[in-house]
Amino acid sequence: MGSAFLTAVEAPMHENAKQAVLKAQDIDIVSCGECTGEPSWQIRNKLADELLKIEAENPRDVAAKLLMEASRGSLAAASRDGDLDVGAVMTGQVCGLITEIKTVRNLVVDLCNDTEELLRKSYTLAL
């Protein structure tokens, strides 16, 4: 759900980052930062490739320090400045299912409607 709310009309996210989430598929998402103990999913880009290389080529403690240095300011670069090369666009693997920018209201209404439909279907299966 977080990824959907990132792309909401009201979200304070640069339009470039929102469009990157809409274009991304599940295979475009990588997990970075395991060496820090705080891994995160993000869209593969120049920064993500650099972070993955750091993690692959260094001992965990060294990689953690290098990764923190390499990623400093990267969230702001993507979300505020719209720089998709050096910015971290953090989104989950579900981003492939996000196909349009909606208002928060519409996201919540859709969630409620979808949940109601699933509950109705699961109830009839149980009979």
Protein language model annotation of sequence segments:
Residues 1-127:
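Conserved active-site-proximal phosphate/metal-binding subdomains
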